[in-house]
Amino acid sequence: MKANVRDASNVRIVDLSGKMTLGGGDVVVRDTVSNLLKEGHKQIILNLSNVNYIDSAGIGELVACKKRAAAAGGDVRLLLPSESVYKVLSIVSLHLVFQIFEEEAQAIGSF
């Protein structure tokens, strides 16, 4: 998994690509979000448009990132999950936990 961080006003957008799985993608997401929080960036959007697979470790890391951001006074929101990733998120009811957006501008404006 690869992560690229972009700045959009006071929001950091993390463009993720690849598989969010145990021992790979979950570590990339954890490290990227942790570094952003350490730098004081509390409003984070994870762009999932190029994530083609997520397993239980990836799901767990999404929840952990949201909790870490909330503890720092921020939030993590999701952008453009693929149909297969959205299906997994909805099966485990994370579509009720995360704000999920189809448009980047809406996600940015939600903060």
Describe each region flagged by the PLM.
Residues M20-F98:
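Amphipathic alpha-helical interaction surfaces in cytosolic regulatory modules
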Residues E83, A105-Q106:
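Acidic phosphotransfer microenvironment of two-component signaling modules
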Residues Q99-E103:
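Short acidic-hydrophobic, aromatic-tinged amphipathic segments that line or gate anion-handling sites
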Residues M1, I108-F111:
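Short hydrophobic/aromatic patches at helix-to-coil boundaries
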Residues R12, Q106-G109:
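A short acidic, often aromatic-flanked loop/helix-cap motif at beta-alpha or helix-coil junctions
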Residues M1-D15, N35:
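Short beta-strand/loop segment at the start of cytosolic alpha/beta domains
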